[in-house]
Amino acid sequence: MEVTFFGTSAGLPTKERNTQAIALNLEPFSNSIWLFDVGEGTQHQILHHSIKLGKVDHIFITHMHGDHIFGLPGLLTSRSFQGGEDKPLTVIGPRGLQQFIETTLRLSESHLNYPITYIEIDNHFTYHHKGFSISAHLLNHGIPSYGYRIESPTTPGTIDVEALKSIGLYPGPKYQEVKSYDNFEHEGQVYNSDDFKGPAKPGPIISIFGDTKPCQSELSIAKDSDVMIHEATYIEGEKTLANNYHHSHIEDVFELIKQANVKRCLITHLSNRYNHENIQLIKQQLKTHEDVPNFEFVKDFDTFII
């Protein structure tokens, strides 16, 4: 799996960074792509990447602020002409999302050539799709804002070739049956497939947060995440300001990483007051502290393998 950032700025775009948009490539579990938030200009950012809109079959919106949704109408209409014809799309997000999209399309006399299924969240939400389990929890941002927890499918254990050879079964087409079914038959005897496979490997857990100040529900979303994507609008000494505006300070994120046992944190939604040089300098200063957890400040077009 891969995650790519098409926008990493908070509130307003800058010369270096666009507003919020994240793409999650589900391979090898699926050939689909999921988008999380679609800030203004997202479709233009995607033109600089190999991602195709026709492969996007789910869009998740964290909240209804403009820097997270103003790119939606244009991206949806462009999808009609970029491989999305007749390919269903599911759009998930807070109440009002369907009205925003349909009103914009109606007033602009725009027409889509594919169906959209809308799912609007009210406080808490659980969704299952092709082995993935997605849950959404309400955060604290003044308006309804959600964090998404994505639990990937479990990968079956690898075949124990030596164990199969011990019963006289050598590499061949029968091995696919061992991989795919609970039981298999060999020379008149039925065997349990699990006895000839290594332990199953849990898929990665990814948590993606909308804008929020610290709140209890963050722990449920982030717990044991292999990758957590979190906002830190304020990364210097502006903690009171972060709290007043229902945002997170970098120290808040560090505390969550430790409490939730997060393996890796990718920090986005940085205030537009910071340029690339500022961010790198602050990062170097933070890395000098012994108790700083594993984190990265991300920039537009960064891609990370999960």
Swiss-Prot record:
Residues bound to Zn(2+) 2: 67-68, 211, 269
UniProt: Zn(2+) 1 binding residues: 63, 65, 141, 211
Record's keyword annotation contains Cell division: no
Active-site residues, as the UniProt record annotates them: 67 (proton acceptor)
Keywords, ordered alphabetically: Endonuclease, Hydrolase, Metal-binding, Nuclease, tRNA processing, Zinc
Cofactor note: Binds 2 Zn(2+) ions.
InterPro entries to which the protein is assigned, alphabetical: Metallo-B-lactamas, RibonucZ/Hydroxyglut_hydro, RNase_Z/BN
Record-listed E.C. numbers: 3.1.26.11
Cofactor(s) annotated in UniProt: Zn(2+)
Pfam families named in the record: Lactamase_B_2
Family recorded in the similarity comment: Belongs to the RNase Z family.
NCBIfam families: PRK00055.1-3, RNase_Z
Role noted for this protein: Zinc phosphodiesterase, which displays some tRNA 3'-processing endonuclease activity. Probably involved in tRNA maturation, by removing a 3'-trailer from precursor tRNA.
Complexes and interactors: Homodimer.
Annotated protein name in UniProt: Ribonuclease Z
Organism: Staphylococcus haemolyticus (strain JCSC1435)
